[in-house]
Amino acid sequence: MEPPAIPHITEGFYPLPEIVETFSHHVLQELVSLAEVLPSMSNVEKKKKILDWLLRSRAFTMRLLVLARWVHLSPSVHRCIDVVAFLQGQKFCFQNLVHVLQDIRYQLSFARLRNSDLVTALDILSTGTSLRLANAPTSKLYMLSESPLSTKQILQTLHALNMLIRIRLSLYEIIPTPFQHFTIANGRCTFTVPNEFSVSLTTNSQDPKSTGISFQWIVVDFQFHLPDFSSTPAKYRVFIELHLNEEIAAAFVLQKPILPLIYNILHKFCLYQRLNLLSQQTFQLSRESWLGHLRGVYDEKPPRLRLYYWPQLNVKKEGKPGKIGHYIHIFVNTQPISAFERTLSSKRSSCEYDHFLLLVEWHHDGIVEHVPLDDHMDAQHLLLLITQKHAQLILEQIRKELHPNIFSEHVGGGLKIHVFDNEIIVKVNSVTGRLVLSSSASPLSPPRHLRAAEKNIALNTQPPAQILNRLYFFCIQTQLLEVAQCAELHAVQGYYSFPYLTFSKGKWRKDGDSLWVLAYNVESNSWSVRLLNAAGQTLYTQDVHTTKGTLSIESFSRLSYLLEVQILLFNVQTACQARGMPFEYLPIPPKALIEDDFTTYVQTGCLCIMMPSSNEDMLPVVFVRAHDGQLIFDSRIKGKLPYQSETETEKNCYIDWRTGRITIRVQNFSSFEKTWIGLLKLVALSKTSAFNVDCITLKHVDFTYLDDEKFRATIHDDNTFTLHFFNRHSPFHLISQFLQDTFSDGPSAIQPLRVIMDRTRGVLVAQELGYVVLARSLRQYRIILSKNHGIQVLLNRHGCILQDLSYLSADSRYLEGTQTLTSQWEPCSWLNTVWEGDLGDDELNGQIEAAPEMHLIKMNKTADLTAILKRILAISRKK
């Protein structure tokens, strides 16, 4: 028979191809990381970084070379290792056999003796000898063979044991609460505590009603169920079973409950075993991924574990690191039994056992927090859980110390700081404890200023919040300068210091070296428009209302455009101040339908001024805007006018006659003021009661006089008026040139024209009768009756005077001549004859008064001049 082959040992060995592949991946990863970092470094830093990497990689490469050369000798070495392992295994089997024999000897001391051999005793006592003992010890008859148990007997025995154990547990044993769930099978009872252990017990007692608690229990199997724990080695299992049986034997003698004792021993052993596993995992982490950032201290008396992490956060005193103020304390402690548990306690679920727990305390900033420990949580998960909580505390502290106007929020385990369109994301590395800064615009390769801020924070020279405040303001300044340059703006220095940034254009400089600038307050995130003199003093300032839009080149162009608008509005304000007119600057709602809705970033504004107006139909409130280098004035007319078309545009003025809205586009305030005066006169004309208003436009108003005389009042650019009578035979054509200056700006602007037309109509009616009428002015007229005879009509405030005149020597063609020719007219007696013969005072009801000696007829205001002249002229024709 050939001896068995020596087993080949593979545990703890790694194939060389896997080592080479792992090393290759590691080198490639470091090269990729190096390629990302090198472009942002200086030449000296690049050389230093490459040299460090070469020295470190050379050491690993030399080790790999040694392993490759050793491969040639590895078969012989492996064979020696297998032989040594085989011999050590045989030695362990021999030693284990000795220990097992000792244990059997110890355990058999508690076994019951077999029944007396009555057959042999009777044989010896009756015959004096025994046939079975007569043979030599080497004889086969020396060993008495026992009849083997049948399967039925075995099953009956196991069933009897199961019933015995079930009765004992149901009626007589005190079962701790963790042992509530158990299984009885194959003559044993198995108690399982999840994530801790399972233990199997049996008995050699035959009576479940043993007095007291003298029921004999024997541990026959044990297994650990701890997470991250391999199967229980045989030597540990045997040791634990032996220890448990010894404790059971001692408790059997002292009459103590067995099951609570077993649970206390095994539960406490599992807790200490888990604490030991956490210590081993911590030691492994401190040598690998957490190297330099973790230190574990394990104390055996009493067993406890302290984890010190992030040593760079130690408080420094006089340049020396102080005591660590944050660490994790893991230990086993007993918890008191609550009153609720005592109330629910029973024999089947007893609380009379040691309530040992594995507790985790987190010490930080003088505060102790209890952290729940999951059954499946290892050392790395526990560290990550604690460091993430610590990171949140650090980020929250930084958030509180940030500038009040810096908007930040917790997102995804980090702190997000908003800088216009971009975002600075601040996170804490869970392993190193250092702050990591990244940008949303370039998350893989953060800008140089972010890396510089990381370095300053790592040096721990200043509080992180102070560095982040400066970084925030630096990012704002950098982004503003970049966008301003694209928007053709340049930064202005020397006028304002931090926190203001000012921008301007060359064309914004006014006379006297005053300058318009856009000022941005980086602390309050607010814009303003300012006018500065040469000494840097602020002459005028106006806040700019911005919305939540993004800052871009388009938005900056909008700001530039807004400043140009503000310059125009400032000129209007200056004009209003000079004229003593009240004004107020108002922001326009962002959803208002206006023409200069350029972007959604800047909320434009308008100027509200109060224009002087004596016309109640014209609203004095005027809103002023600016667009494309022009001033836009908006106002309204109250009431409904007899318009010719619904809307009308005349040069720089637009009006909607339906709503009365007026829009005037001009270059300066003086032009608007001139147009405004013209509109006041136009509205005053349209609201008159002296005439019937037929139609109104921006240039003229059409009237009707006495239902048959239609004429038009036209307004010129210099706010003067001309009258035009549509009827070419109208008698008023004679005096139209004298009617131009009869208008005023009041509500009764056209009333004098009605009075004049009413009083002159009686004189001018002579034209309709075929006589020549001469107008020297609106008060003096001559009616030519013949070549050498006429009537002079003088209008005054009291009435009218008719004087009879005759022409001496001048030719009729000179009747329209100068005053010299007119003076040649002399009074005559014809009018006296008319008065004495055909006109009587009674007939005209006292409306006229004759003065024969002066050849005059006087009439008061109420006299009907038209009727009187018709009467006189009719009489003259008869003669």
UniProtKB/Swiss-Prot annotation:
Entries under InterPro entries matching the protein: Med14_N, Mediator_Med14
MF (Gene Ontology): transcription coactivator activity; transcription coregulator activity
Location(s), subcellular: Nucleus
Gene Ontology CC entries for this record: core mediator complex; mediator complex; nucleus
Pfam families: Med14
Broad class of the protein's primary localization: nucleus
One GO term of the biological process aspect: positive regulation of transcription initiation by RNA polymerase II
Keyword Transcription regulation: yes
Statement: the UniProt record of this protein carries the keyword Transcription: yes
Keywords, ordered alphabetically: Activator, Nucleus, Transcription, Transcription regulation
Annotated function: Component of the Mediator complex, a coactivator involved in the regulated transcription of nearly all RNA polymerase II-dependent genes. Mediator functions as a bridge to convey information from gene-specific regulatory proteins to the basal RNA polymerase II transcription machinery. Mediator is recruited to promoters by direct interactions with regulatory proteins and serves as a scaffold for the assembly of a functional preinitiation complex with RNA polymerase II and the general transcription factors.
Family, similarity comment: Belongs to the Mediator complex subunit 14 family.
Assembly description: Component of the Mediator complex.
PANTHER family (UniProt xref): MEDIATOR COMPLEX SUBUNIT, MEDIATOR OF RNA POLYMERASE II TRANSCRIPTION SUBUNIT 14
Protein name, as recorded: Mediator of RNA polymerase II transcription subunit 14
Source organism: Schizosaccharomyces pombe (strain 972 / ATCC 24843)
The organism's taxonomic lineage, starting at the top: Eukaryota, Fungi, Dikarya, Ascomycota, Taphrinomycotina
Name of the gene this protein is made from: med14
